[in-house]
Structures are given as C-alpha cells and as structure tokens.
Design a protein with these regions (language model features):
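Active-site segment of SDR-like NAD(P)-dependent oxidoreductases
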Residues: 87-89, 128-136, 174-177
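N-terminal Rossmann NAD(P)H-binding glycine-rich loop of SDR-like oxidoreductase domains
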Residues: 9-37
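C-terminal substrate-binding subdomain of Rossmann-fold SDR/epimerase-dehydratase oxidoreductases
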Residues: 199-200, 204-305
Length: 305
C-alpha cells in the first residue's frame, strides 16, 4: 500500500482525528502528516485543540485551534485522539513538583474525559522512554516527577481505554528530530546545532553513547496509521541508531563544517534506546519510509532558521 493510500485510509476509517496539544512539536507534526492529503479533506477530518483559542499557519494554510472547553464539545464518536498535550520535562526546573503535577493534571483532564465520554475509536498516548524506570518493582525508584507521571499515566490511560472499549496506542518516545522542534535547551541534537553555529565546535561528552532518532512527522504518521486499525499496541519509538559522535559529525556536515570541529570527551553514559526494531518493523508495515539521519538533521535545522 502506498503512503498516500495509507494516509487516506487513516482518515477514511475514522470519523475524525483529534490533535490535542496541536501547537506543540508533536501536534504540528501530526498535522503535517495528515495535511499531506488535499487540504479540504484534512480540514473536514481534523479537530485541533490547544491550551487556548488561536490560529496556526502551517505550510501556507491557516488552521483554527480550539480551547479545551470548546474543543471537547466538538469531538465525534469514533474519533482517533492524538494526545500530544503535556508539560515539557525542563519546566520542572522552573516549577515546584506540586505545581508541575497540578498543571499536568489540568491538561490531561480533557484527554481522560474524551475517553470516558466520546466513544473514541482509539487513543494515542505519547509516553517517554523514562517511564521504563518504573517497569520493575525491584528497581530503585527515581525521584524525577516527570518519569513517575509518565508511567502512572500509561497505567491510567490503559485502564480508561479498557473500561470504555477504546483501542490504546502507547508509544514511549526516546529521541526525536524534526522541523517543528521547540525544545532548544535540553536536547543533545539542539545543543550540537547551537554549538556548531555559535562556537564552530561541538563538545561531545559521551561520544560512544547510542540513541535512536526518528523524525517526528514519521512517528506521528506511523502512530495515526496504527490507530486507524483500532487495536491495542504498545511499543518504543525507533528510527536510526547512531552514537553521539556520529550525530555530531552529521550535524557538522549538514552545516558545511569540518569534523575537526569535534571535541570528544571520555564519559561513559548508558545508551538511551528502546526496542527500536519493533517500531521500525511496524512503520514499514504501515508503509512509512523513515527518514535517515542526514535528512532528519536537514529538517531539524529548519527549526533554527
């Protein structure tokens, strides 16, 4: 099945696609994927919900984003709910844990209400690779509230979906790229780009550490295509496996700079990867041709322009 046909079936098999957190990195990436169809078809099928009412100009088209109180009333029975609304991890540095949890509880309330009240076809939960820290009872529990909350929401969404006959697509995200990147301070990739642009040098503290990178639009498309099947699926994000040294080298190449600008450290950090082969296989089955790391970096550099 071609990607164009697959995208069509994703929309045709669902009454509606709801993107919650539409103005964020993953929300815009999901809209990018769906908008690859004729704009008129996309506008008929998509409901965008954000923290407030506004308009989003994406790829030359204006899209209305509804506030939560208005948006939830427009969710149709049989919709796919793409849940991309969540406070970023680095906000824990600016808020107390209590404030962070309270604000996230306010945000996820709409998602939980949608599952309970709207008879959704499927619900897509964007979790995080850090949730695995809580997978085994014998492990020492970290104090990071972000990790703890991601794991607890996996459990809650699973229970809600099971009780309301809604298929759950749960994806633990490890490392992303893409032109809608909006987190510039705490990601290795964005840090490398900043260093290369400002210092003409990239400091790679853990050159041998491995990560898997996937383009956010490729990830969103794979998730939406799977969600259209109406089946429970849980997996880690995947993409291309690279070391931090290889990533830095590709960033320099993308900026037209020489690899002599690398400053390599000797810190041994654990790899940050999940069962990426499963995701890559699922993406292939869905007809999604994942971008290689060079193309991913080229797309990501657009976020800095």
């Amino acid at each position: 099945m071609t990607l164009e046909k697959l995208q069509g079936s994703t929309l045709d098999q669902s009454e509606q696609v709801v993107i919650y957190g539409a103005n964020g990195w993953m929300g815009r990436s999901a809209l990018d994927f769906i908008s690859a169809l004729k704009p008129t078809i996309a506008k008929e099928k998509i409901l965008l919900i954000g923290s407030k009412s506004c308009f989003l100009n994406l790829n030359g088209s204006n899209h209305e984003i509804f506030a939560p109180s208005t948006g939830i009333t427009s969710i149709r029975e049989g919709a796919i709910f793409f849940n991309a609304a969540f406070l970023r991890r680095e906000l824990l540095q600016k808020m107390t844990p209590e404030e962070y949890l309270h604000k996230n509880n306010e945000i996820v309330a709409l998602a939980k209400s949608a599952i309970k009240e709207k008879k959704l076809l499927s619900f897509i939960n964007l979790s995080s690779g850090v949730a695995r820290d809580f997978d085994h009872e014998f492990q020492i529990k970290p104090t990071d509230e972000y990790s703890r909350l991601k794991k607890s929401l996996e459990i809650e969404y699973s229970e809600y979906c099971s009780q309301n006959q809604t298929a759950l697509v749960n994806c633990r995200i490890f490392s992303l790229t893409g032109r809608h990147l909006n987190e510039f301070d705490n990601l290795a990739l964005s840090s490398f780009v900043y260093q290369a642009k400002s210092k003409n040098q990239i400091d790679v503290k853990s050159p041998s550490t491995k990560r898997t990178y996937v383009d956010a639009t490729d990830l969103a498309g794979t998730l939406l295509s799977i969600a259209a099947l109406g089946k429970d699926v849980s997996f880690d994000s995947g993409g291309e496996l690279v070391t931090m040294r290889q990533l830095a080298e590709r960033v320099l190449a993308g900026l037209g700079k020489d690899v002599s600008a690398l400053a390599l450290g000797d810190i041994e950090s654990p790899d940050y990867i999940g069962e990426f082969e499963k995701f890559n296989s699922l993406a292939s089955e869905m007809g999604q041709n994942l971008l290689g790391i060079e193309d991913q970096i080229t797309n990501t550099l657009n976020a800095f322009n």
